[in-house]
Amino acid sequence: MIVHFNQSLQTTRAGREGSRETFAELAGRVVESLATLPQQGQVDVRTLSTLRIHLDWIQYRANFRDPVIVRRAIDAQGRMLALAEIAIDLRQVEAERLTPLLADAQRALGSHARLPRVGPARGRRPAAGIPSAAAAPGATVGIPSAAAALGAPVAPSENGPVALDDFRPLRDGLLWEFNRLFWHRLADWEAASGRRFEAALPTGKSDVEHPQAIADSVGDFWTLLRELEARSQLPAEIFAVEIGVGSGTRARLWLDRFKALDEQCGSAYYSRLKFLLGDFSPRTLDTALATMGPHAPIVSVVAMDAVNPLKTLSFLRFKTLYVHVSNVYDNLPFDELVRRDGRLYVVETRPYVSAATARHLVTEFGIARTELPGLVRRLLSVGPEAFDDHDRGMAFWRCVWAGLRLEERLRAIDNGDDGHVPPGLTLQHLDDLLDAAPYDIRFHLSRGAAESFANTLPLLHPRGYLQVQDIFVPAMDEYRQGFKGPGKLDGSLVAWVNGALLRAVGARAGYDVHFAPFRYRPGSKVTILFTTQRD
């Protein structure tokens, strides 16, 4: 048996009566519990030789994981492999439930039945205003069995969870349909929740609105314009683009500062500026444009697919001096890959709701258990209008999202198979990433971010640059130092972006990619990516 410590041993959580418990102390309890299982005859010791225990620390209070989960591995044809993993989220798991949870997980590895397990997760609460059986005391859910990992149908028992879809790579999962619905129906969600989506962020607002960060960004851009003007290379029209506009506050503050600096220096750049706001959500664009105030005459809004800005903005190819992207890449489709003992696997997930959540939905909305997957599909297709009453449709959507969980399994990737490689990259690029990675690793393949990045670079003027504010993993080794998502936001999701992958994409396009810490707020997880063109 191999135990993986996927977090700093000094990480702490609040224990009972206000005490602090470290990751190391909690890990010690896991080892003690594991040691008792063979003594109690609750595990076949022959299974331990291929078992891996992963000790995680999922920092997102809302997420898609139960405290203890089982992962099995299959080959490309779907046949069971020997590799097995038990993953434990030490931030959620209750100490007194640890031994029975591990016993259930061990039995599930060799069982073809779904075994009950006591919940809920430690500290988990339903979203505000949502009655959620997923967080009810004494709720029970099931540990996925070996049969479940192979994709066998979920048992129809009233005590079992309800699968909402088949196993698929993360990039093809239902999560992205929920995400798309959220951004298309943002106004409906905010009305139902009673707060703007920014309130779901850890600090209640985005770091991109920090005034000093904006002032420095404006100063850097103004300096570039001055240098180009000194060389008689400044275009008559100065194009700048912001992708991922949020409420529009950041763009408004940036334009306020740019105009003030321009007037102070008498440089007359503001009158030549053409500022474009691009976003996926029409409602977001309308809100952002209304925020522009006196800058509206120089601002245009463009609805675009964030994965392919070039498709909409092709008229700006090689013309844009400044592109700013904020909090977009962490909300684009990705895969997760795993390397174990030199073999590569893709993580496949199956969305489900627990038996307790299913019972609540059946009772609250007057539907049959067997109708749940179909009704969720209809919700994702047409929105809350899947119900005759809009408010009930919204309540159903919010309750399903609050209770949504993911089963996981590992599907082996055959040598030479490139179906998991993002467009624009090759197996060689992935091999280069893995060469710089720890031997055993689980990491994001940020497909959507890589495509968006590659489809933004052609917009840049030869002296232009791209600046991205997001949560990045700049080096592959950092994937062993903490959980990088996905986390669950209020209606949406977030995952850290593989910065090492973007560095490879940039190199292919002739750009160096740099990462700088966001120094304007202590403790911020945000990193600033910026590009420089190679000579």
Which residues are covered by each model-predicted region?
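Rossmann-like AdoMet
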Residues: 2-129, 149-239, 247-320, 337, ...
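Class I S-adenosyl-L-methionine
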Residues: 2-50, 54-57, 319-535
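Long, intrinsically disordered low-complexity tandem-repeat segments
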Residues: 129-150
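Conserved S-adenosyl-L-methionine
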Residues: 244
